[in-house]
C-alpha cells in the first residue's frame, strides 16, 4: 500500500532520461547471438548473491514496516547491488587465475528478480499489518474486552512455524495464477509496466562500456555512504542507554515540539528513503504531520471530558487514540477506493480499445511497424514457453493444500471462503496486473481491504476479526505476487532473459523469502519492543488493520463520539484531493497532497516526515547544482544510507538479545531542572 503510493508518483528521473534510449544502450546484434540457455542464466553464484541481498533488504524493509509502515521502492537499488556483487565476484576470481563464466545481463536480471522476490515477502507478508494485528498486544491496544467485536479468542501470537507455512500456502498460489497470460499481457497488449521497464533499462545500461563506467561511480558512492551510515548508527548506539535517550530524542525544534513528535532523529534510513521518494510524497507526509500533531490532536486533547471521558487513558480506542486510528483509516480508504475505481475504469477502457483495434485489423498494422529488434525480443520471449499444464497443476495443488491447511491454522476462516477466494483469484490478479501494467500501481492492498470488510461482516462477531485479517492476507498475497511476476516478465522481455529462468528465480526468491521473512521479523520481535505506541517500533498498521476488521464486524458503533463526522470529512477530502489532482493541469495538480501519505504521520508522528524532507532537500540542492550527476548518483547514495543504517540492526539486535545495553543515556531537559 505505502510502496504502491510511491510507485505511482515516483517515475525515477533516471527512468525518464534513459527510457527512450533503450535501443542505444546495447549492441542488438551481439546481444541476440550471445544469449545463454535458460538453465545457464540461473547460477550458483547468482543464488548466493540473491540470498545475501535478499537478507540485507529483508532486514531493512522489516525495520521500515515496524516503525512507520512506509517502504520505498528498492528495486533499482537491488539491481545495482546485484551488479556490484557479481562483477566483484568475477573480477576477484579472474585476478586469482580462476576461469569463470562471463557475467551477463541475463544473470543480472535473474539475481535482481530473485532478491526482490525474497525481500518482497518481508514487505507484503503482513508482519507489520494483518498478521501482527492478530497478536495480544494489538488486541489490547484496540480496546480489549471494552470494544464490541474485539474478543480475546480472536488472537494468535506470532510464531515462526505457522507464519512460514501460511506464507508458503498463499504466495505460491499467486506465483502461478497468471503464468498462462504472460504473452497476452507483455506482447499482445504491450503493457509498459514502468517499474519493470526502468529496471531493464538500468540493467541493459550496466552491461555496456559506457554503463560500466557509470556503474563504477555509483559503486564508489554506495560504498562511501554505506560506510558513513553504518559507522554513524554504531556511534549513536553508545548514547541510547534508555527508553528516551540518544540522538533519536534530540529536541531539534525545542522541547515542546519534541513532545508533539516534531524533531530530527538523525535516521539515515529515512533520509535515504526521502531521497528516493518524490518531493510530493515527502511534502504530503509533512503536511499530514502538521495537520494532525500540530493542530488536530492538541485540539481534540483539549476536549477531554466533553468528547470522551477524562478518566480514559490516551491510548484507549474510545479516547484520543481512537480518533488517530479511525481518521487515518478514512484517509486510506478514501484514497484506496478512488484509485481502485479509477484503475478498473481505465483498465476497462483500455481493454475495450485493444479488442476493437484487434477486430479492425489495426493490431496487425502496428505489428508491421515493429523494429526487427522488437520482433526478435518477442520471439525469444515466446520460445522458452512455460507449459500450461505446469501452471494449472501447480495452482490446483497449492490451492487444495491451502484449502485444507489454512482452516486448521485458523478455524475462524471457513474452507468455503478459501475456495471462493481461489476461484476469484485469477480474475482479480489479471485485473490488478493489467492496471499495474498501465499505471505502475499495485492495488493489491485495496483488494485485500475489500476482502477484509466482506469476510469480517460475513464471519460473525466471534470469528469476524480473525477471518477478516487472514482473508485480507490471502487475497492480497495472491493478487500482489501475480502483478510482481508480470513486472519481472517485462524486465526479462527487455533484457532478453528467458521466461523460464524468470519464473524459476521468482520461485526460488519466494521460497527463500518465506523462510527469511519470519526469521527477520522474530529478530525484531524478540530484541525490541514491537507494538509499543510510545517506542520506536510502533507497527502502526497492525492497529489500523485490526480496527478495520472490528469496523467490519460492528459497523460505526466502534467509533468514539464525533469521530464518524470527522471520518466522513477526511474520506471526502481524500476523494476530492485525488479528483483535483487528476483534473487540474500537471503544474498545479502535481502539488496536491497525497492522502495516503498524509495518513501515515497521523499515527506515527512527525519525526520521520522531517527526516524524509531532509532527504528531499538534499536531492533538490543536488539537482540545482548538477542535475546530470544527481540523476546518476542519488539512487546509489540513498541506497548506501539505507543499507548502512539497516545493516546495523543485525549487530544491535544480537547485543540486545545478549543483554548488552548501551553505556550512556543522553537526554534533554529544561534548564530550570538542571540545578
UniProtKB/Swiss-Prot annotation:
Any GO BP annotation: seed development
Annotated GO MF terms: oligopeptide transmembrane transporter activity
Stored InterPro entries: OPT (IPR004813), YSL-like (IPR045035)
Subcellular location: Membrane
Keywords: Ion transport, Iron, Iron transport, Membrane, Transmembrane, Transmembrane helix, Transport
Name of one Pfam family that matches: OPT
Transmembrane spans: 42-62, 66-86, 114-134, 159-179, 219-239, 280-300, 325-345, 386-406, 408-428, 450-470, 504-524, 556-576, 602-622, 630-650
Membrane topology per record: Multi-pass membrane protein
Keyword Transmembrane helix assigned: yes
This protein's record includes keyword NADP: no
Tissue specificity: Expressed in leaves, anthers and pollen grains. Restricted to the vasculature.
Induction info: Slight induction by manganese, copper or zinc deficiency. Inhibited upon iron deficiency and induced by iron overload.
Record-level GO cellular component terms: plasma membrane
NCBIfam families, per the entry: OPT_sfam (TIGR00728)
Protein name per the record: Metal-nicotianamine transporter YSL3
Gene: YSL3
